[in-house]
Regions:
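Catalytic cores of the polymerase beta-like nucleotidyltransferase superfamily
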Residues: 1-231
């Protein structure tokens, strides 16, 4: 249960996991911040979603299909379309979640996304975004099977550099990592290793001490071996 956000997760006896959420609305104190949540009608709930494809609902009472933003049309076209012009300014992490969906499901961003995203990538907007949320969204992205495609989409949009100060390294080093527990953290360290100033980026992301120590040890070992990860 997450009372503050009005959400819960239920594991049914036969193994199915169901996420439940109250109909609610969110208010962002500043761009990228954790939202303040309160109960609201379903119409208000849908208008806060990231993209039209996840702004659809079914009224279980009358089985009416609610699709105020053309989500079914965009779903059929495999398009990720934000709901309003300030969607990314309101929450810059929306583009990271969108890149994950696009990479995982073979979707693409709507043609207006680069134009709508540009104001959200301005330094003054990024400076106000929650670094903890940015970090968590990056880690979730690195857990994806198609994580490199998601990173490439973010790089293509200019979001990887603007939001994280990261350049996209070659894919080959990542392919050598085997799937195991903690894989997203290993991918994150490898991603940081290929930056011009890995420790500065790690500090900016406010990584836990154990990860920064691990990165420092990795860098020291590479220096000793006469190697460099910077691109």
């Amino acid at each position: 249960l997450h009372y503050a956000f009005g959400t819960a997760r239920v594991r049914l006896p036969f193994g199915l996991v169901v996420d439940l959420a109250e109909s609610r609305e969110e208010v962002y104190p500043y761009p990228g911040a954790l939202p303040q949540v309160r109960r609201a009608p379903i119409a208000r709930d849908l208008e806060r979603r990231d993209y039209s494809v996840n702004a659809m609902a079914v009224d279980l009472g009358g089985l009416a299909f609610l699709d105020p933003y053309g989500g079914l049309r965009d779903l059929e076209a495999r398009l990720l379309r934000p709901l309003h012009p300030l969607a990314f300014v309101e929450d810059p992490t929306r583009v990271v979640r969108g890149a994950r969906l696009a990479a995982r499901l073979g979707f693409r961003f709507a043609e207006e996304v680069p134009r709508l995203l540009a104001p959200a990538l301005l330094p003054e907007v990024v400076a106000g975004a929650s670094r903890s949320r940015l970090r968590e969204e990056l880690l979730l992205t690195l857990e994806e099977e198609a994580f490199y495609r998601a990173l490439a989409l973010l790089a293509e949009l200019g979001a990887l550099k603007a939001l994280y100060g990261l350049d996209l390294p070659p894919e080959a080093p990542f392919l050598r990592l085997r799937a195991e527990e903690g894989l997203s953290e290993a991918r994150l360290l490898l991603l940081l290793f290929h930056q011009k100033d890995p420790l500065e980026r790690a500090a900016w992301l406010a990584l836990p001490g154990r990860l920064r120590e691990g990165l420092a040890l990795l860098l020291a070992a590479m220096v000793t071996a006469g190697m460099s990860g910077a691109v």
